[in-house]
């Protein structure tokens, strides 16, 4: 007797028919005519237009500047290679979980560890055909996200179960469910071709990218294409890419999504050209580095950026100038680019009678953003940052705020805090003017003191004035609502020394120095923490991590025991160098620092491996088995 599963029973109830199709596991295969068609209604989108014919290619893009064909004809050295990267997961420690409570007033309260509470509210309402105002989402302290905790997963199910049961319902994914059911980042195929003159000027670059979207459309392939050659001032560029559905979990963001894959190709070829031209790899990059006014292939020109300053910092660092000692030791470098996001952010600031302030914002803190946001508000109000008490609130308390991702939080939500603090400052000046009976324009806030410019005897500290608010017109609350567009961008670089075990193919990281342009490091130790964390994840991506599927398409390493992420036992201390080239699109020059740091490590490690062994790798991860195979073939 075989007991039927709930799934089998449900198939019988609804009279379903199942059509078994051949698996599609990679983007290159999924884009061919030989592959199975996974969706009966999917057609390729090209800049908003749907193309005829069923396909697994969900979308296609193309960016071009200059005359690429002529530029390659004029190039004196051309290198073209193909690269493949495996599917990898963000590896957050806390699994997906949600608690929902359907109340008697037909409103539902959701508690969830998410990077985007307002997005969860909107998507849950859309999924369940509810009004947005019926749903309140409270973001909890989040145990890691890295871009992977934006999508909607169990929330609608928990809401419906709570409605039916009349009780709160909590759902927690197992680790296996996290790996198999939530969004990893894309596996990819990248083809890269770069042409240069004998003097070392890059004049042509071409890229083709095919990224896995998972079961449904939406890979970061276009972002990868925009970042692919962004570090360099190249007059002739062509980048094309496709988003391909495959039989894997629907992808989600992972720190600078798409950029790490494409940068592996660009930076290893850049390194190879430098070697063939007998040029120092940093000098070669400096000769061709993007600067203010450089136009990217997708159109925009860079404002003031820190690419050359970053490379100069790398060139002058003791790590670069120290000797390489020991057998099978190699040194490599790479640089990378990622955008800063803007988007809507809201913040409110309330002044307390003791002179402290409560700052309320709607973007969850997953990297110390509460501290950096509070410090920006304190700067405006000329008070001690310890007097600012920041908190992240639920969706009923504040206007719509974008989530914590895209390197936007310290930048955009910090800017909202600046605007709220400016509102408080102006209201405090107006209150002081009312108390003193003078014009507002006659009052300034200096070093925490409100001072009359015409009468030096008229002055009140921030705390003194705060204590008088209730009796002189009532409390003061400031509002900040902003959606910045001048968001800039960030560059990161690595110098890495590796040791290769030529008997096993194992790569050990001996020394690692991370560089990043932070614009203005509001909280330097938190910036360093972000740089170190992203670097470690980039190292894991380079040498350990991958989704391993068997011939039947089943994931075989869906636990932390089998999905090998680096730990402190595998790594040296990650040294950090913060470069500060102020972002002209922010009041304090801030650039996002949470993502760019994951972009260059795989390429830097691949270049170090070449320096140690003479072999060029074009796959991720560079696991011992893959490296050993290349060593044997090379010998």
Cite the ranges covered by each PLM segment:
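Short, exposed "boundary/linker" segments that immediately precede the start
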Residues: 1-9
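Active-site "cap" helix and flanking loop/linker of ATP-utilizing ligase/carboxylase catalytic domains
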Residues: 525, 529-562
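Cytochrome P450 core scaffold surrounding the K-helix E-X-X-R motif
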Residues: 519-523
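Generic long, charged, amphipathic alpha-helical segments
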Residues: 389-391, 567-590
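C-terminal substrate/ligand-recognition segments
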Residues: 540, 593-618
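A glycine-rich dinucleotide-binding beta-alpha-beta segment and adjacent secondary-structure elements
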Residues: 328-336, 555-574, 583
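Amphipathic, heptad-repeat alpha-helical segments used for oligomerization and assembly
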Residues: 257, 408, 579-597
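Structural alpha/beta core scaffold segments of enzyme domains
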Residues: 10-12, 16-17, 21-515, 606, ...
């Amino acid at each position: 007797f075989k007991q039927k599963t709930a799934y089998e029973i449900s198939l019988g109830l609804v009279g379903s028919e199942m059509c078994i199709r051949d698996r599609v596991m990679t983007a290159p295969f999924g884009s061919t005519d030989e592959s199975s068609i996974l969706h009966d209604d999917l057609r390729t989108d090209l800049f908003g237009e749907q193309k005829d014919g069923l396909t697994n290619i969900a979308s296609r893009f193309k960016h071009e500047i200059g005359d690429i064909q002529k530029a390659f004809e004029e190039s004196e050295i051309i290198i073209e290679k193909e690269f493949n990267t495996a599917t990898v997961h963000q590896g957050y420690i806390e699994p997906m979980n949600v608690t929902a409570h359907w109340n008697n007033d037909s409103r539902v309260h959701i508690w969830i560890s998410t990077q985007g509470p307002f997005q969860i509210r909107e998507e849950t309402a859309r999924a369940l055909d509810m009004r947005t105002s019926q749903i309140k989402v409270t973001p909890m302290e989040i145990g890691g996200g890295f871009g992977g905790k934006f999508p909607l997963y169990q929330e609608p199910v928990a809401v419906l179960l709570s409605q039916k049961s009349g009780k709160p319902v909590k759902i927690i994914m197992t680790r296996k469910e996290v790996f198999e059911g939530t969004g990893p980042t894309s596996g990819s195929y990248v083809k890269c071709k770069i042409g240069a003159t004998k003097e070392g000027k890059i004049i042509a670059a071409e890229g083709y990218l095919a990224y896995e979207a998972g079961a449904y459309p939406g890979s970061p392939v276009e972002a990868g294409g925009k970042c692919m050659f962004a570090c360099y001032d190249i007059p002739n560029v062509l980048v094309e890419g496709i988003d391909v559905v495959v039989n894997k979990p629907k992808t989600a963001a992972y720190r600078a999504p798409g950029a790490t894959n494409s940068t592996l190709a660009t930076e290893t070829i850049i390194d190879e050209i430098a070697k063939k031209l007998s040029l120092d790899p940093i000098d070669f990059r400096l000769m061709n580095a993007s600067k203010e006014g450089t136009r990217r292939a997708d159109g925009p020109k860079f404002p003031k950026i820190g690419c050359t300053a970053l490379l100069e910092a790398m060139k002058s660092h003791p790590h670069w100038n120290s000797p390489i000692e020991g057998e099978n030791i190699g040194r490599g470098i790479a640089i990378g680019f990622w955008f800063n996001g803007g988007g809507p952010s809201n913040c409110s600031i309330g002044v307390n009678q003791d002179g402290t302030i409560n700052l309320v914002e709607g973007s969850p803190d997953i990297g110390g953003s509460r501290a950096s946001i509070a410090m920006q508000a304190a700067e405006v109000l000329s008070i001690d940052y310890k007097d600012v008490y920041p908190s992240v609130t639920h969706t009923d308390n504040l206007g719509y705020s974008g989530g914590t991702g895209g390197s936007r939080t310290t930048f955009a939500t910090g800017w909202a805090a600046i605007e709220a603090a400016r509102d408080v400052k102006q209201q405090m000046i107006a209150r002081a003017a009312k108390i003193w009976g003078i014009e507002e324009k006659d009052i300034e806030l200096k070093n925490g003191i409100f001072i009359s410019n015409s009468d030096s005897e008229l002055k009140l500290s921030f705390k003194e004035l705060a204590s008088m608010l209730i009796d002189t017109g009532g409390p003061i609350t400031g509002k900040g609502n902003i959606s910045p567009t001048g968001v800039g961008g960030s560059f990161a670089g690595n110098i890495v020394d590796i040791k290769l075990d030529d008997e096993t193919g194992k790569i050990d990281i001996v020394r690692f120095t991370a560089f990043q342009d932070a614009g203005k490091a509001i909280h330097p130790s938190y910036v360093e923490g972000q740089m170190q964390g992203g670097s470690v994840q980039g190292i894991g991506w380079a040498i350990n991590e991958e989704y391993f599927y068997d011939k039947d398409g089943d994931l075989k390493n869906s636990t932390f025991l089998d999905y090998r992420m680096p730990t402190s036992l595998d790594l040296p201390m990650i040294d950090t160098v913060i470069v500060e080239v102020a972002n002209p699109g922010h009041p304090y020059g801030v650039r996002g620092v949470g993502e760019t740091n994951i972009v260059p490590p795989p390429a830097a490690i691949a270049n170090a491996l070449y320096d140690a062994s003479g072999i060029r790798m074009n796959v991720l991860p560079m696991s011992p088995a893959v490296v050993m195979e290349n060593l044997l073939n090379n010998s």
